[in-house]
Curated annotation (Swiss-Prot):
Binding note for cofactor: Binds 1 zinc ion per subunit.
The protein's name in its UniProt record: Methionine--tRNA ligase
Subunit structure, interactors included: Homodimer.
Gene for this chain: metG
EC class name: ligase
């Protein structure tokens, strides 16, 4: 017997600073669907997920709660595992970066970097974003904030170890160019090459000495290992790399697919490959950066408070409707919208009307006309061939779709068969055949073809919607559900008993359910909504230091290579100034030209994205940063006027 093909897929390991949201669920459900599909095809497949538990942010949250970091993450991790159980995630291993085996392996990895001369000790001085666990230079900041998440950064200076990233940059560029599928989609590959690698890599800070919640460096224990070095190593330490038990590593590495969100693809396609090169290990075969789930047009984020709780959706609608929406409605590789109304309408149209109706009608007719017993297909006609051919060709189409990570298209192909089977019922009119005793054999053949088509549907749908696939198999008493069995349209045994059972997907009153969800969301917001804490008290002398002036916007244009910055030329009492402002997500340049706004006029000039900014435009934002408004000034107030 030949050895099974191997398949190793990973999700990111999630940062347990709070409960996970539907965006995190998306990555994990997609990975689960892919690994289940490979198992169906007979692969020896392994799925890894887990949690990234170290770092300054976790330590601060735990301190605020008066508990240890480990106690805090233990509680969050339990919730994550419960969520994956609810979502029917079939992972093979859940790694925690606090696991002893991982800690020891990471220490060995860093020691090897040190022994090979890849890291050195120096001092770091710059800006640090605690939520992102990222370091930034002055020129990389946007309006003095983190360019990734837009939150405040802290000035930090401390002794640290650095990795010589530039040593491997040319080698990585060549590897990416020689392996066009290594980074996908194509747009992500181009971004990594043109925005990060080719302009030149800076050495990476890989340790911290200002806090202690992390893995200690064995040869300098006042340092803990920077969280990304710790986290990225999980993909090999989970398999036993660096331990005495490395059987899984030898079996499954290199990974076939790292599936990650586009916001962390830089770490997975630059830092991680360079780490592997330094360790003289093979690189993963592919890193795929999917898009974001957007709510009301904006990115979903725990910090913004606009997250969709998957537990609420599961409790209201069940697991498979949530999986279906995520897998089918989000273009894989692009951003997608999560919307309650679209979600419920898709349940009604695709799951209840198309699939649920087909199963119910088929089972009901077999019960009604043949006492629940499937008849042999002895009276075939030409009209049967299109349905049969579509079923037989389905596995090959799905195989091609999954190889290219076209998950929505794979579900489309399954639904093509579902819709064709529904049309087949209308074409063959079983209820008319049932009235003619001489047509009983033909009626039995039609119903056999429907059950056999549903065998193809149930078998291929199970990786994507596990509960639904199993329910169909149970109702129709499907016994043969292997990939090999899909090579022929004859896997249903005549004489098999079927039972109609419960409706798989009841229809939902859209307006009523949306109203219920909106009320539930408002209650949750009320429970969590808090005013931002006031800043420390200042004196009137501090207020007097601010020079707030009315200015008029003369010109405005986007800043190249920035998603947030606009460059404004403003007039201040006869003087012209250039100001950069991070408001491009809220204003088009043409909307600002001619407006009078408020400027902090005596702010020390600074360079942002390499361009001079002589002041700061004042604006007010909602708590979740989803909306922002400049302070508009009446036209009759002259520029240069003091705002008191």
């Amino acid at each position: 017997m030949s050895e099974k093909k191997k398949f190793y897929i990973t999700t990111p390991i999630y940062y347990p600073s709070a409960k996970l949201h539907i965006g995190n669920t998306y990555t994990t459900v997609a990975s689960d669907a892919l690994v289940r599909f490979k198992r169906l095809q007979g692969y020896d497949a392994f799925m890894l997920t887990g949690t990234d538990e170290h770092g300054q942010k976790i330590q601060r949250i735990a301190e605020d709660k008066g508990i240890t970091p480990k106690a805090y993450v233990d509680e969050i991790v339990a919730g994550i595992k419960d969520l994956w159980k609810m979502m029917n995630i079939s992972y093979d291993k859940f790694i925690r970066t606090t696991d002893e085996e991982h800690v020891k392996a990471v220490q060995k990895i860093v020691k090897k970097f040190y022994d090979n001369g890849d890291i050195y000790k120096s001092a770091y001085e710059g800006w640090y974003c605690t939520p992102c666990e990222s370091f930034w230079t002055e020129t990389q900041l946007v309006d003095g904030k983190c360019p990734d998440c837009g939150r405040p950064v802290e000035k930090t200076k401390e002794e640290a170890y650095f990795f010589k990233m530039s040593k491997y940059a040319d080698r990585l560029i060549k590897y990416i160019e020689d392996h066009p599928d290594f980074i996908q989609p194509e747009s992500r590959k181009n971004e990594m090459l043109n925005n990060f690698l080719k302009p030149g890599l800076q050495d990476l800070c890989i340790s911290r000495s200002s806090f202690d919640w992390g893995i200690p460096i064995t040869f300098d224990e006042k340092h803990v290992i920077y969280v990304w070095i710790d986290a990225l190593s999980n993909y090999i330490t989970a398999l036993g790399y660096g331990s005495d038990n490395d059987e899984l590593y030898n079996k499954f590495w290199p990974a076939d697919l790292h599936l990650v969100g586009k916001d962390i693809i830089r770490f997975h396609t630059i830092y991680w490959p360079i780490m592997l090169m330094a360790l003289d290990l093979p690189l993963p075969k592919q890193v795929f950066g999917h898009g974001w789930l957007l709510v009301d047009g904006g990115k979903m984020s725990k910090s913004k408070g606009n997250v969709v709780d998957p537990v609420v959706l599961i409790n209201e609608f069940g697991t498979d409707p949530v999986r279906y929406y995520l897998l089918h409605e989000i273009p894989f590789g692009s951003d997608g919208l999560f919307n309650n109304e679209i979600f419920i309408k898709k349940i009604n149209s695709d799951l209840a009307n198309d699939l649920g109706n087909l199963v119910s009608r088929t089972a009901a007719m077999i019960e009604k006309y043949f006492d629940g017993s499937i008849q042999p297909p002895v009276d075939k006609e030409e009209i049967d061939n299109e349905l049969i051919d579509m079923a037989i060709s389905l596995p090959e189409k799905l195989d091609e779709d999954i190889k290219k990570l076209k998950i929505p298209e794979a579900l489309d192909h399954i639904w093509d068969l579902i819709k064709r089977a529904n049309k087949y019922i209308d074409e063959t009119t079983p209820w008319v055949l049932a009235k003619d005793e001489n047509k009983k054999a033909r009626l039995g053949t039609v119903l056999y073809n429907l059950v056999e088509s549903l065998r193809f549907v149930a078998t291929t749908l199970t990786p994507f919607l596990p509960e639904t696939g199993e329910k169909i198999k149970t109702q129709l008493n499907i016994e043969l559900d292997t990939w090999e069995s899909l090579s022929a349209f004859d896997g249903t045994r005549a004489g098999t008993k079927v039972s109609k059972g419960e409706v798989i997907f009841p229809r939902i009153d859209v307006d009523k359910k949306i109203e219920e969800l909106n009320k539930l969301k408002e209650e949750q917001l009320k429970a969590t909504r808090k005013m931002q804490p006031l800043k420390p008290e200042i004196s009137i002398d501090d207020v007097d230091k601010l020079d707030l002036r009315v200015v008029k916007v003369l010109e405005c244009e986007p800043v190249k290579k920035s998603k947030k910055l606009l460059k404004l030329k403003v007039e201040l009492g006869g003087e012209e100034r250039q100001v950069l402002s991070g408001i491009s997500q809220f204003y088009k340049p043409e909307d600002l030209i001619g407006k009078k706004v408020v400027l902090v006029a005596n702010l020390k000039p600074a360079k942002l994205m390499g361009q001079l900014s002589q002041g700061m435009i004042l604006a007010v934002a909602t708590d979740d940063d989803s909306k922002l408004y400049t302070l508009d000034i009446p036209e009759d107030i002259p520029t240069g006027s003091i705002v008191r």
